Amino acid sequence: MSDYMRELRARVGSRLLMMPSVTGLVFDDQDRLLLVRHSNGNVWVAPGGAIDPDEAPQDAVVREVWEETALRVEPIHLRGVFGGPEFRVRYENGDEVGYVMAVFECRRVGGELRADGEETLEARYFAASELPGLALAEWARVILPPLMKRSERAWIPPVTWR
């Protein structure tokens, strides 16, 4: 947890915080998607996390992918911006976060794939056909299947506001 988040949590306790965040979609040469298994919740997600104060989203996704997988990446497309009830997470300590997530497709430019052993326990590539059998985070179940269809265009889910 960043110093910024610690300070916020000291002020608001476990109440809901809306958090700008990023996720990186990294594909291998067989169009398999890189996922990491998080230690918190033991679920699979694409690498990503919170945007730090004064950090640009494109820098945050590069940093987060590096921290979680040891891969150097370059963002090449913004695939969408997502939020809603599926993006609300209650952590084991009771903290609640509602993520608003900018999702970038990224190109691998260096590094050797490995999980960090703390935040991420495992990192590997999965084919689209393997996703239904995985223990995915709720938000990942919503957005990853359509985003596996690679495109230079953003994907916008159906509008639900009435």
Where are these regions (language model features)?
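Acidic, metal-coordinating catalytic segment for phosphate/diphosphate chemistry
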Residues: M1-T23, G94
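Short clusters of hydrophobic/aromatic residues that line enzyme substrate/ligand-binding pockets
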Residues: L8, A46, L113
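Conserved beta-strand and immediately adjacent loop positions that scaffold enzyme active sites
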Residues: T23, R32, E122
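Conserved Nudix-box catalytic region and its N-terminal flanking loop in Nudix hydrolases
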Residues: D28-E68
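Short, flexible helix/strand-to-coil boundary loops that buttress conserved ligand/catalytic motifs
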Residues: R37, G48, G117, A135, ...
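Charged phosphate-binding loop/patch that engages nucleotide di/tri-phosphates or the phosphate backbone
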Residues: V142-R162
